[in-house]
C-alpha cells in the first residue's frame, strides 16, 4: 500500500480473509445490526458478506475489483463487479466497513456519497459505516498535532495498491 501520508505499508493476505473471531469489535457490532436485504460495499475478499450469509442475511457483495468479485463468488456469496455510484437496486442495509466512508474520496465528494447512499435505502433502511481519524499520524512527541492549515483536509489521502506485478491507479480516499 502506497499513500500520500506515510511510508509504504503491507496488508497481509490473512488479514483480508479474517474469520468473525478475528474481526475488530466495531466490525462485529456492525454485523449484528445488519438486517433485511444487505449490500456490502467494497467487499474485498467477502469476509463480512460470508459471515452475514451464515447468519441468514440476504447479502449482495460489490467491489470494483474483478478479482475480488471472483473470489467472493467462489466463496459462495453473490457478488457483482460494480461501482457503488452505479448501483440502482434498493436495500434495507448498506454496509461500508474497513474505512468505508473513504469511498467518498474527499470532503467535496461526501455529500454526493451520502445522497447516493440514501437513494438506495428502502423505507426505514440503515447505513452502517466506519472511518478512521488519522490525526495520530500528525501527533508530535509532546502530544500536540501539527497540521498545515493551508493544505487540504489532512484526512484526504491518495492511495495506490500493489500486489506482485499488479498496480492500481492512484485513488483518493477520505
What function would you assign to each model-found segment?
Residues 1-33:
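S-adenosyl-L-methionine
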Residues 33-44:
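Conserved class I S-adenosyl-L-methionine
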Residues 45-56:
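Conserved SAM-binding loop of SAM-dependent methyltransferases across substrates and taxa
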Residues 65:
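Conserved SAM/SAH-binding beta-strand->alpha-helix loop
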Residues 73-86:
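Conserved SAM-binding strand-loop segment of SAM-dependent methyltransferases
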Residues 90-111:
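A short SAM/SAH-binding and catalytic strip from SAM-dependent methyltransferases
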Residues 111-123:
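A short glycine-rich, Lys/Arg-flanked "PGG" loop and its adjoining helix->strand segment in the class I
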Residues 123-174:
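SAM-dependent methyltransferase
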Amino acid at each position: 500500500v502506497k499513500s500520500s501520508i506515510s511510508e509504504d505499508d503491507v496488508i497481509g493476505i490473512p488479514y483480508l480473509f479474517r474469520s468473525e473471531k478475528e474481526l475488530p469489535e466495531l466490525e462485529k457490532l456492525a454485523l449484528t445490526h445488519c438486517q433485511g436485504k444487505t449490500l456490502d460495499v467494497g467487499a474485498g475478499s467477502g469476509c463480512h458478506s460470508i459471515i452475514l450469509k451464515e447468519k441468514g442475511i440476504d447479502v449482495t457483495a460489490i467491489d470494483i475489483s474483478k478479482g475480488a468479485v471472483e473470489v467472493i463468488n467462489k466463496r459462495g456469496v453473490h457478488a457483482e463487479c460494480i461501482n457503488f455510484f452505479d448501483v440502482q437496486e434498493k436495500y434495507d442495509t448498506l454496509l461500508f466497513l474497513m474505512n468505508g466512508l473513504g469511498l467518498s474520496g474527499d470532503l467535496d465528494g461526501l455529500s454526493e456519497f451520502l445522497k447516493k447512499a440514501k437513494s438506495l435505502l428502502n423505507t426505514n433502511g440503515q447505513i452502517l459505516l466506519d472511518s478512521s481519524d488519522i490525526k495520530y499520524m500528525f501527533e508530535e512527541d509532546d502530544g500536540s498535532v501539527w497540521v498545515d492549515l493551508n493544505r487540504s483536509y489532512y484526512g484526504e489521502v491518495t492511495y495506490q495498491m500493489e500486489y506482485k506485478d499488479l498496480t492500481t491507479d492512484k485513488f483518493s480516499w477520505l
